[in-house]
């Protein structure tokens, strides 16, 4: 396991959520709030970076007031209520994904299409909505997703156990398709990812890679991992992420992010 150089002039800490910052029960550890308070007291920005919806992340971190958030796998970046960056999918591509998912009900597929503040679904059975709820708190049921008006920035498909790669392969669409979890496949414009979003935020704030710490565990974190000098893969990370990161943090079940940050705040070179 590794630590951050105690002499590093860190200005930004970006954390993936599931499998990284959240504990084994998918919750924010109680002791996290004290660590974040210490970061903020030093002028260090704490930035959740997730496939989750902006509204969901804002509610989860409401105790911190207005903070910067990278949401929807990097398709939107907010600093408080100010939009720093977003990337909108062509409506024709949205309809292509809707049709593709409808054709693959053998994979128990359910689609969420994501606007900046609201997500939309045309399937509302209990099983699917339970899967959607942790990630999309502002969600609206519609009879036909193809009738939704307004900008769409990401689409997320929920599938059954062991079927994410089958779904990803089945989405023959003019978009970037990313496996973002054990039951989730995301589709967004090519070249859009958490790394691009982090870069936009760094530029806006005048923060360099050397002043940035990133924690991640899954392939949708890869580009973000590459955008920071202090890039940490969790001990439970996917092999691709472990290979790309410069350092390793203890597993999320051991509150690894907090261990590394606490060591830095206390000026320790060992966990």
Q: Model-found features: residue ranges?
A:
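Mg2+-dependent phosphoryl-transfer enzymes with acidic/Ser/Thr/Gly-rich catalytic loops
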Residues: 2-12, 28-29, 188-271
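Asp-based phosphoryl-transfer active-site loop
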Residues: 9-25
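Residue-level signal for inorganic ion chemistry
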Residues: 19, 39, 50, 73, ...
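Active-site phosphate-binding/coordination module
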Residues: 24-128
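Short active-site oxyanion
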Residues: 41-47, 65-67, 153-155, 210-212, ...
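Short, structured coil segments at secondary-structure junctions
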Residues: 63-65, 73, 170-174, 227-228, ...
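Short hydrophobic/aromatic-enriched beta-strand-loop microsegments
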Residues: 66-73, 87, 132-133, 177-180, ...
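Conserved acidic, metal-coordinating active-site core of Asp-based
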Residues: 104-215, 219-227
């Amino acid at each position: 396991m590794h630590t951050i150089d105690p002499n590093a002039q860190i200005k930004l800490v970006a954390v993936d959520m599931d499998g990284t910052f959240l504990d084994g029960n998918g919750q924010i550890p109680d002791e996290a709030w004290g660590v974040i308070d210490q970061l903020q007291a030093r002028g260090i920005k704490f930035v959740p970076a997730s496939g989750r919806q902006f509204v969901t992340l804002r509610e989860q971190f409401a105790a911190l007031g207005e903070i910067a958030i990278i949401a929807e796998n990097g398709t939107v970046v907010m600093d408080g209520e100010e939009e720093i960056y977003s990337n909108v999918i062509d409506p024709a591509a949205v309809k292509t994904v809707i049709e593709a998912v409808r054709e693959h009900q053998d994979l128990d597929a359910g689609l969420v299409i994501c606007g900046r503040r609201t997500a939309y679904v045309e399937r509302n059975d209990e099983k699917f909505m339970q899967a959607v709820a942790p990630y999309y708190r502002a969600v609206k049921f519609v009879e036909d997703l193809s009738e939704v008006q307004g900008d769409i920035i990401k689409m997320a498909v929920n599938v059954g156990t062991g079927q994410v790669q089958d779904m990803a392969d089945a989405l023959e669409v003019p978009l970037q398709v990313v496996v973002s979890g054990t039951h989730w496949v995301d589709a967004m414009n090519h070249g859009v990812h958490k790394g691009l979003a982090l870069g936009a935020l760094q530029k806006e704030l005048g923060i360099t890679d050397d002043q940035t710490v990133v924690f991640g565990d899954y392939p949708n974190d890869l580009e973000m991992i590459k955008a920071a000098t202090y890039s940490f893969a969790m001990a439970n990370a996917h092999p691709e992420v472990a290979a790309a990161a410069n350092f390793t943090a203890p597993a999320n079940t051991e509150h690894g992010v907090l261990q590394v940050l606490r060591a830095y705040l206390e000026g320790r070179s060992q966990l």
